[in-house]
Structures are given as C-alpha cells and as structure tokens.
Amino acid sequence: MKRVAAVIEYDGSNFFGYQGQPDVRTVQGVIEDALERIFKQRIYTQAAGRTDTGVHANGQLIAFNCPNDRMTTEDIRNAMNANLPDDVYVKEVFEVPVNFHPRFDVTKRIYHYFILTSRQKNVFLRKYVWWFPYELDLDAMRKAVKYLEGTHDFTSFKTGSDERDPVRTIYRIRILRLKNDLVLIRVEGRSFLRRMVRNIVAALVKVGLKQWEPEKMKEVLEARDRSAAAGTAPAHGLYFYKVLF
C-alpha cells in the first residue's frame, strides 16, 4: 500500500470548515466520501491545516494511504476530480514516504488575505475578499508587521478556545497593493493558532486607518491578552495559499 499526497483547492463559501463533522458539509467530508466511492472502502485523510468556515484554499495539502497500488498518481487525481463537487479540485497527486504526515512534516504555511478598498462594492467578489471601503496607509501597516515577525507569544491574536502553546514563528508578512484597489496581506509561518491570521489582519487594519500607531502592535503582542487586540477579519477574505515541506 503506497502513501500519496494531494494538493487541493476549494471555495470555502459553502463548507463548515475543513475538518470533518457529523451532519454538516465539510471539505474533509466530501474528500473522504469521494475516496470511498473510488476505493469502495473508507479512506482517512490528514491535512496540513484546518481552515474555518468560509475560508478558501489554493494549496491545502492532504495525505492518505492508497489501497490500489496499480493506480498511478494521475489516475488517482482524475478519479478524485470525477467524484468531487465543483467547489473542490485536486491540482496534483504525488507519492510520499509511508510515514509522511502533512500536519507535522510541513515546514512553512503561507496564507493570503485580500481586502478590497474601493468605494463601490463588487458583488461578484463578495464571497472572496473583505470589502472595506476606506483608504489604508500601507506604509504604516508595513512598519507594524515588523513587530510580529519572528518567534513570539501570540496569545493576543488567538481565540480563547485554542489551548495550544501560543508561541509561534512568523517568518515574514508582506503587504502589497494590487490593481483595482485590492490589497494583499501575505503571512508566512511554520504554524498558526486558530484565527491567528484573521486577528492579525484586523489589527493591521487598525493601523492602516491610523487609529493605532505602528508601535501599538508591539504593545498588543506583549500584553498577551486577546482583549488588547482588535476584532477578527471576515473569513471569506482568507486563503490557505501554499505549504512547503
């Protein structure tokens, strides 16, 4: 029995997050249902990240044991895509070592967050960007991210229900202005706490609006208190973009 990994993209709009749950539609659920139709047995998958309700993915990585050694990786990809709904797509399948685990063996996770700052709403993008019709000072936001890069206790930027070790490493945060008033916030790190990226984005927007000075980010981080930070940016602007391993 060989082990394979698959790079998956999905539109998170109509899912209750990635992780499988009873009685609701999840990304893991539809993937494992598709694999069961292909292999006539339940196949359990592991993923590099568990995205929340409404969050999208360009490069989610999953792994599973394939019970049919005669199928090529291209056969598996084609069979999965033939059995998956239109809002999930397998971009690539490849073999990995038998002990490979996407959650633990990934060395970098990259998230993208999109903010549309135009005064007019774009109804076609409403599920895929955060429409925020205010001018943002990107230079101030770029100064603020320097306080977040590196290894820190990110208690101020996690949800209260996340009991994991709050110490995380952010390798880099980039803020880019794209065309048509679209702002991209790219966050690179080894691993993240629940809603950590969205909470960071909300805090950066405070800086961009000049409600906070860039130095406020250091104060919030050192407070180690969720109530010291801003709110949470909407889920639909966030994309699990890519992993490296």
Curated annotation (Swiss-Prot):
Where, in this chain's numbering, is substrate bound? 111
Q: What is its EC number?
A: 5.4.99.12
Where is the catalytic site? 52
Q: What's the domain of life for this entry?
A: Bacteria
Classification via CDD domains? PseudoU_synth_EcTruA
Query: GO MF terms on file?
Result: pseudouridine synthase activity; RNA binding; tRNA pseudouridine(38-40) synthase activity
Task: Kindly list the biological process annotations in GO that this record carries.
Answer: tRNA pseudouridine synthesis
Record protein name field:
tRNA pseudouridine synthase A
Show the PANTHER family listed in the entry. PSEUDOURIDYLATE SYNTHASE, TRNA PSEUDOURIDINE SYNTHASE-LIKE 1
Keyword list (alphabetical) reads:
Isomerase, tRNA processing
Subunit (UniProt): Homodimer.
Q: Which family does it belong to?
A: Belongs to the tRNA pseudouridine synthase TruA family.
The record's listing under InterPro entries reads: PsdUridine_synth_cat_dom_sf, PsdUridine_synth_TruA, PsdUridine_synth_TruA_a/b_dom, PsdUridine_synth_TruA_C, TruA/RsuA/RluB/E/F_N
Would the keyword tRNA processing be found if you checked this record's keyword annotation? yes
Which purpose does this protein serve, as stated in its record?
Formation of pseudouridine at positions 38, 39 and 40 in the anticodon stem and loop of transfer RNAs.
Root EC class: isomerase
Q: Which reaction does it catalyse?
A: uridine(38/39/40) in tRNA = pseudouridine(38/39/40) in tRNA
